[in-house]
Regions:
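N-terminal glycine-rich phosphate-binding loop and ensuing alpha1 helix
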Residues: 1-46
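Hydrophobic/aromatic residues located in beta-strands of well-ordered beta-sheets
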Residues: 2, 43-45, 89, 119, ...
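Short, high-confidence coil segments that cap the C-terminus of an alpha-helix
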Residues: 40, 86, 114-118
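Short phosphate-binding loop-to-helix
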Residues: 44, 50-109
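A conserved hydrophobic position in a structured secondary element of the catalytic/binding core
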Residues: 47-48, 99, 175, 194
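Conserved core of the sugar-phosphate nucleotidyltransferase
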Residues: 100-187
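Donor nucleotide-sugar recognition loop
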Residues: 187-194
């Protein structure tokens, strides 16, 4: 099941999922990108807002109301997992209207082959602005491609703050049911999520 969490009360940009981008709301654009890869019946928007719920219904998008107590998009996906049991869940953030269809396709295929692992998509950091930005999550992996550490800081760091080979998170994740079940029991955010 591909779940698109959508929160109306964003601190930085309230109402973000409903913002029109060339006449189409952001959440609908994100859904449309996902629908190019995944069948409509296997996509669900999870929201805590009636405006988003109504927009999804109007656009024939499967939607579920979730609690307004969810701290993160992953909490919203964990809440969906309590109601709809699947082997694994793919989380595509609702504010990714330009997410690459090819990236979604590759990620879905990889997730199907690795259903027992938590998977976090990433790509190269291409510019110094992203490398230094606290809004971009940077990631460090071991030689087996296992995530060691994620940070809003510029990692790996260097003395001159120059761009070096670095990776950033892409807002698409995959979780096995059991991992989401455990995640849903955590009631606090880590500092990186704040």
């Amino acid at each position: 099941l591909l779940v698109i969490p959508a929160r109306y009360k964003s601190k930085r940009l309230p109402g973000k999922p409903l913002i029109n981008l060339k006449g189409i709301p952001m959440i609908v654009r994100t859904y449309n990108q996902c629908k190019k890869v995944v069948d409509h019946s296997k996509i669900l928007v999870a929201t805590d807002d009636k405006k988003i719920l109504n927009l999804c219904k109007k656009n024939n998008i499967n939607v579920m109301m979730t609690s307004n107590k969810c701290l993160t998009g992953t909490d919203r996906v964990a809440e969906v997992a309590k109601k709809i049991k699947k082997n694994f869940y793919i989380n595509v953030q609702g504010d990714e209207p330009l997410i690459s269809v090819n990236d979604i396709k590759k990620f879905v295929e990889y997730s199907k082959k690795n259903q027992n692992n938590v998977i976090n998509a990433y790509t190269n950091v291409e510019n110094l602005k992203d490398y230094l930005s606290p809004n971009v999550i940077k990631m460090i992996f071991d030689k087996s491609n296992n995530l060691i550490y994620a940070s809003r800081s510029n990692i790996p760091g260097n003395k001159k703050n120059k761009l070096i080979k670095a990776y950033k998170q892409v807002c698409i994740y995959s979780f096995p049911y059991n991992h989401l079940k455990l995640f849903g029991k955590i009631k606090t955010k880590t500092r990186i999520e704040q």
